[in-house]
Amino acid sequence: MKSLYSATSNEAAKNANVSQAEFEKRYQESIENPDEFWGREGKRIDWFKPYTKVKNTSFKRGEVSIKWFEDGELNVAYNCIDRHLAKSANKVAYYCEGDKESDEKVAITYQTLHDEVGRLANLLKRQGVKKGDRVAIYMPMIPQAVYAMLACARIGAIHSVIFGGFSAHAIADRLNDCEVKLVITADEGRRAGNTIPLKHNVDMALDNNACPTVENVIVYRYTEKDVPWFEGRDLDWAVEVENESTECPAERMNAEDPLFILYTSGSTGKPKGVVHTTGGYLVYASLTHELVFDLKPDDVYWCAADVGWITGHSYMVYGPLANGTTSILFEGVPTYPDSGRIGRVVDKFDVTILYTAPTAIRALMAKGDEATRSSKRDSLRVLGSVGEPINPEAWSWYYSEIGNSSCPIVDTWWQTETGGMMMTPRIVQGDVKPGSCTGPLYGVQPALVDAQGVLQEEQGVLVEGGLVITDSWPGQARTVYGDHERFEQTYFSTFDGMYFTGDGASRDADGHYWITGRMDDVLNVSGHRLGTAEIESALVAHPSVAEAAIVGFPHDIKGQGIYVYVSAIAGVIPDEELTKSLKLFVRQEIGPIATPDLIQWTSKGLPKTRSGKIMRRILRKIAANEHDQLGDTSTLADPSVVDDLIENRLNV
């Protein structure tokens, strides 16, 4: 595909920190001599005890072990706050933009960040939270969410941030899996003019001692909603920290001590608690944030992600703060009160870098010039995309309308498990192709394999396959909490000696990579990964459902929508009310983000092989309205089931 613009003639590229030639030289070194390359890059952050070992990793089946800088000691909160204070105490760390445009403009300096984190860290210690204890954070997109993460990091507690859209049931699952000692939440959150009952959801999750390891709940009174209070368990944030000191010593952490657990959907139904550790993660988040966005000291950077997802962790909190950046913390959504909001926020704070998801871009694009007519956006110099592949139409609109045809787009590919960006075009490349994540960053060795694990190494032609990474990088997840066997089984058992991403991809004749979608049973809805098994488990728990199967289908706004095939139990006649009830049931069990878009009731059941396996490939084709491309159906136990599904399909 011909590029839409030549990045090398772009103003941002002319002033780039790292030229393309220099990048290629450093990349080669990172592959050929990783110890020397990362040994040097590791010094971008401060260490209490310098490391002498750099890379000690194995992808060998049954022996998977990932260690970086393993004898070094440091503290993440110290690196994100304290080391900046001598020169930048009064620099703004976050400009906070509330859900309502009329909300007061709030600026949080690095000194304020230090003081608030110190107070909360001391409160956590007073409540008996120690190094290695797990703390869950279920908060709105407000500064206190960041304070909570950094307070945990300061004392060596392991935080697990739970997305504010998850239900009580989903919260309880996560609290129990990692045996959380303390929960930090707020009375309510705000989103698009509505309130989110955060404290209520936590109370429901803890009801009847459902999470026995939880001892206390710290509640930030944000909206001042009158919420139920459990004496002896619940603590008022503001009251409790009032007399705490702003000084809290930073715990010395080994580079391989866990920093956080973040749950990501798996194909088995039970969410995986992905563990990221301290040293390698911070080095990688800091480096990739600076490199990809070509960071300058006076940039105002806006990552429009939620703190409950990995993008919020790496590129709204840890990467930017480690680099001493000024960021935007946005509570709202891009389309509230109208689709011009995102541009007005850019103008209000003179944002120079915008990092958002294709879902948001498509939602704005659908509104036409409403998204751009109330703003100029002339402060922008770099645009970024994250969460899912961006289709060329949305890419072109983002470039021409939001970026005024003057900003390079870094279309990044990475995952919760990778910790940071892995592949992206660079702003100094001249042959940018809309929709392509192009090529790897330092230390990343991508490859394509066929079903037998044979590397597809042919160059100069289009090749397709499963996307694997053939060697380790510092930001890589180390394990699944409490289940290293699952970690190995999920990521390293499919192809021995390689990390399997679960994504399919192609590499074109120019060597550029294109992500084609998930190869496992995980959906990517609005840039958020949802396990089909988890949703299916919720559906079959409904008293009227006998069997259910979930697939994704192309959705103009979300990228992928959720298409549900359901069989009712005997005696139940499906109708519109039951369909509504089922959608509500899923919302309550998992959260609004998992709400099905389309529910098709099946009168003849689901298509299965003679061995009883559901043929999801067929369900995907029908949901995508590609029923004329079903392929081989010879193993179907009852072909008439497929005819019935096609005749009654909903996505027409």
UniProtKB/Swiss-Prot annotation:
Binding residues annotated for Mg(2+), in chain numbering: V540, H542, V545
KW Acetylation (keyword) present: yes
Gene Ontology biological-process entries: acetyl-CoA biosynthetic process from acetate
Modified residues (N6-acetyllysine): K613
Record: residues binding CoA: R191, A192, G193, N194, T311, S526, R587
Keywords: Acetylation, ATP-binding, Ligase, Magnesium, Metal-binding, Nucleotide-binding
InterPro entries (UniProt xref): Ac_CoA_lig (IPR011904), ACAS_N (IPR032387), AMP-bd_C (IPR025110), AMP-bd_C_sf (IPR045851), AMP-binding_CS (IPR020845), AMP-dep_synth/lig_dom (IPR000873), ANL_N_sf (IPR042099)
GO cellular component, one term: cytosol
PTM info: Acetylated. Deacetylation by the SIR2-homolog deacetylase activates the enzyme.
A molecular function GO annotation: metal ion binding
Pfam families registered for this protein in UniProt: ACAS_N (PF16177), AMP-binding (PF00501), AMP-binding_C (PF13193)
Alphabetical list of SUPFAM superfamilies matching this protein: Acetyl-CoA synthetase-like
E.C. number: 6.2.1.1
Record field: catalytic activity: acetate + ATP + CoA = acetyl-CoA + AMP + diphosphate
Cofactor requirement: Mg(2+)
Gene3D superfamilies: 3.30.300.30, N-terminal domain of ligase-like
Positions that bind ATP: G387, E388, P389, D411, T412, W413, W414, Q415, T416, D503, R518, R529
Role, per record: Catalyzes the conversion of acetate into acetyl-CoA (AcCoA), an essential intermediate at the junction of anabolic and catabolic pathways. AcsA undergoes a two-step reaction. In the first half reaction, AcsA combines acetate with ATP to form acetyl-adenylate (AcAMP) intermediate. In the second half reaction, it can then transfer the acetyl group from AcAMP to the sulfhydryl group of CoA, forming the product AcCoA.
Family designation: Belongs to the ATP-dependent AMP-binding enzyme family.
NCBIfam families the record matches: Ac_CoA_lig_AcsA, PRK00174.1
HAMAP family per UniProt: Ac_CoA_synth
Protein name: Acetyl-coenzyme A synthetase
Protein species of origin: Marinomonas sp. (strain MWYL1)
Gene this chain is encoded by: acsA
